[in-house]
Amino acid sequence: MKIAIVNDMPMAIEALRRALAFEPAHQIIWVASNGADAVQRCVEQTPDLILMDLIMPVMDGVEATRRIMAETPCAIVIVTVDHEQNMRRVFEAMGHGALDVVDTPAIGGPNPKEAAAPLLRKILNIDWLIGQRVGLERVAATPRAAPSRRDRLVAIGSSAGGPAALEILLKALPVSFPAAIVLVQHVDQVFAAGMADWLSSASGLPVRLAREGETPQPGVVLLAGTNHHIRLLKDGTLAYTAEPVNEVYRPSIDVFFESVTRYWSGEAIGVLLTGMGRDGAQGLKAMRERGFLTIAQDQASSAVYGMPKAAAAIDAAVEIRPLPAIAPRLIEVFTQ
């Protein structure tokens, strides 16, 4: 994989060089010391992946991500030394299309290979996404009971560009929205709590991490919060699970959508937002085949038109809508 580093700190650059050296297939093709330089270098030689710092002179990582995704799109991972202090910037960058976030590896310790492992795992996942090799082993659906108007669920999946898309969608929903909402966003568990807090503040709706064993209810938005998959169980409660182990991204949108298809006994809507790869497409199709309304974000409003495109290609979406039109449609369906 051809990788570029955008960072103004020599120690951080050296840490990334050493971490990448553990995987001979990775080639560093250039290094930029600020976002403006990176934007220009991408025009000259677009990499497969950029490891992007947040705080830099001239142009920061948020603006550089926005410019690169608009002009010469490629995979971007935010690499930061202090994600807690920079949480808002992290999700702004992800809103512009950054795929993931990872701490700068601390390679000066006794086990540098272990320190490099989180970064290398994320790069491996992104390599799979770029190749669109993500798949799902389909499972037979359990016939659902007749819908109850009291049991309503919106299942939403998103990846690259998702934080900003989720902010827009949730902000357009009333606090009195009468359906439970569960979000599955591709984000590491280290950043999940911060994302929930950020979404809650930005949208005006209460957003928190989903807890093992709880039942989705109207009035609170639940975000999958670990590096395990989240599933709906037969009794209507949520559970985290390591299976299936072959899913590239954890939590998997497909896994959650499939569980809704099998076990949700009321009304449900599946929504697939911006993101790279195919995760969510097969699960959305399963929801459609069980009679649920399914919505995919359109190309024009998607930061990365990968997952919704995959859904459209297999006829998984009943409706394809621009992002600003999705919340009004949810309100229309569930307030009739």
From Swiss-Prot:
Family matches, as Gene3D superfamilies: 3.40.50.2300, Methylesterase CheB, C-terminal domain
GO terms under cellular component: cytoplasm
Modified residues annotated as 4-aspartylphosphate in this record: 53
Keyword flag Ribosomal protein: no
Active-site residues annotated for this sequence: 159, 186, 279
Location in or out of the cell: Cytoplasm
Catalytic activity: [protein]-L-glutamate 5-O-methyl ester + H2O = L-glutamyl-[protein] + methanol + H(+); L-glutaminyl-[protein] + H2O = L-glutamyl-[protein] + NH4(+)
GO biological process, one term: chemotaxis
GO molecular-function terms, A-Z: phosphorelay response regulator activity; protein-glutamate methylesterase activity; protein-glutamine glutaminase activity
Domain CheB-type methylesterase intervals: 147-336
Statement: the UniProt record of this protein carries the keyword Hydrolase: yes
Post-translational modification: Phosphorylated by CheA. Phosphorylation of the N-terminal regulatory domain activates the methylesterase activity.
Pfam families xref list: CheB_methylest, Response_reg
Response regulatory domain location: 2-119
Transmembrane spans: none
Keyword terms, alphabetized: Chemotaxis, Cytoplasm, Hydrolase, Phosphoprotein
CDD domains: CheB_Rec, REC_CheB-like
Function field: Involved in chemotaxis. Part of a chemotaxis signal transduction system that modulates chemotaxis in response to various stimuli. Catalyzes the demethylation of specific methylglutamate residues introduced into the chemoreceptors (methyl-accepting chemotaxis proteins or MCP) by CheR. Also mediates the irreversible deamidation of specific glutamine residues to glutamic acid.
Family: Belongs to the CheB family.
Protein name (database record): Protein-glutamate methylesterase/protein-glutamine glutaminase 2
Gene assigned in the entry: cheB2
